[in-house]
Each structure stands twice: as structure tokens, then as C-alpha cells.
Amino acid sequence: FGESENVNVKFVAATYDEKGNKLDTPGVEYVKWNGTYPISPLKFMGDNSGKYVSYLWDPNEYINVMMYNFADGGDSDEGTVLGISHMPYTIVGSTALEGLETTKAKNIQKRQLKYPHCVSINSLYANKNGNGGYYESDRYANSNHEATYISPFDVVVTLSHELGHYLGLFHAFSEHKVENADGTTTTDASEGCYDTDYCDDTPSYNRTEYMVYIEYYMKSHTTPRLQDVLLRTPCDGDNYLSANIMDYSYTLGYKISAQQKARIRNVMYYSPLIPGPKKNGANTRAAGYEAEGKLDLKPVIIK
């Protein structure tokens, strides 16, 4: 598509499970669910009772990606949500990352969690669609990797987007945090136009206004043009075509900016509950501060 920052992070499907057993399919474990199905992702990921932590592999060694059918949330849009992720934590101190919930605990073990720290993907959109194809853009099969068709349900973009959240990135449009009655913290698009992702090199825009434009455009055009649906009007500056991985559809969904890369690298190097080598000794018993018992963390869930 175009230029993007190389984050130098490689995701590898596990070949063995947490207990050392070889997996039949790398990266895949099938687990029986005894609760109501389909599953509400907000209720599952926001549950603070500890009953769902057993579904996790050690978050300090693995990124847990749960795939299941999302329940229709009634008045909410859960059933049509493509994916949801927990945001990471940042440790209090000189390397703390703006916008993330802080913690003093450098070494957080799975046994200390009350909730299932993970990414959730709506498996409805990982299956074949009504036409027999998959929910994805045609760029993956095209020899030149150029897209002539953009799927708003592209599961590849969805997973990349949610992993961006998991590694510290917010949306590339104006949003705000919402403290919900059930004790969970989520985010929602803002009515105004502000830069809220803590990255100055990603133009922000009013998502609510864009959705009004798209609804009108789709009703008045039988054959939508890709350039038209990608068009964004930023809070300041010139119009542009959406390409950032942290935007919502319609977007090319491939670009990571320099400041987004810096946030990801900060989380990789300094945050607990994130796999990989650390510069501050996080995730080790020599980290200096290890709480005992269950921790009262404040998870943020973001779509």
C-alpha cells in the first residue's frame, strides 16, 4: 500500500500449550465453554470475580486471543463488534506512558488477576460469508497486493487493530473514556474533534460526523468509490485518505506512525503482562515490587 513504520515485532503461534503439551494446530486451543452462548465480550472481559482467569495462558509469556461468537447486546452493538481488547498498564516512574492506567506492580502473575486480560475476536467474521468467501479485502490474494475491494469486516485488519490496542495504541479519531455502571471502563467516540490518541503524527477526526456522511453516501451511491469512503476531514489541516491501523472502517488499515511505534516499543520494554524482554526487569521476581494476593487493577476495554 505505502510506507509504514517497522515496529520490529514478530508474533509467533505457540506450538506447545502452557503445560508443555504439543498443540495439534499451532496457536490454537479448543476449550469447552459451559456458560451462555454466544458470549457477551464486555461481560466476559469485564468480569472481576476471577472465574474466567483459568481460560488464560500466562500473559507474561503469551498474548491470549479468544475467538467466540459475540452475543447481541440488545441496546448495545456487541453482536456486530468485530473485536475488543484490554489496554496495557504502565508502571509508575520515568518510563510511564501517557494515557494508560498506572500500576506500581512490576511483576504481575496470572494468579493475581481477577479478570481475563486478553483480546477477543468475533468468530462470526472469521468464518466464510454468505458468498462462500472470507471476510477480508482482496489485497491478500492479489499478486501486487493492491486492493480493489475493502471489506469493513476484514478479520486480518481486526486482529492487527486489536493487537495495537493490546500494545498501547488508542483510536485515530476523537474519543473519550466512559466509566460504566458495572465498574468497567470503555471508550466511545466524542462529539467534538480532539486529538486523543497521544500521537501528534496521526491526524484526528470526528467519527460521529464521518458516520453521518457514510450513511448518506451509501444511500445515494449504488457503486461506492473507494476514495470517497476513505476520505477523512481532520480536526485541522487538509483532508486525507484513511490508512492507519487504529482507525475504523472504511480504512486501508495498514499504517503505523513513528509515534505509534514508540508507544508500542515502550509497552514492550516496560509494561507488565506483556511478553518479551524488558529493560526495567518487569515480569521477573527481581523486579523490586511484587504484590501478594489478588490485585485491584483497573482494566480498560476498548473496541
Per-region residue spans from a language model:
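The catalytic-center signature of Zn2+-dependent metalloproteases
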Residues: N127, Y135-K255
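A short, structural micro-pattern
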Residues: E5, P59, L113-Y115, G237-Y240
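Pan-zinc metallopeptidase signature
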Residues: A243, D247-K303
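Short, solvent-exposed loop/turn elements at domain surfaces
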Residues: G20-K22, G73-D77, G130, G253-I256, ...
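Long, contiguous hydrophobic alpha-helical segments, chiefly transmembrane helices and signal peptides
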Residues: V9, I63-M67, S120-I121, T158-L159, ...
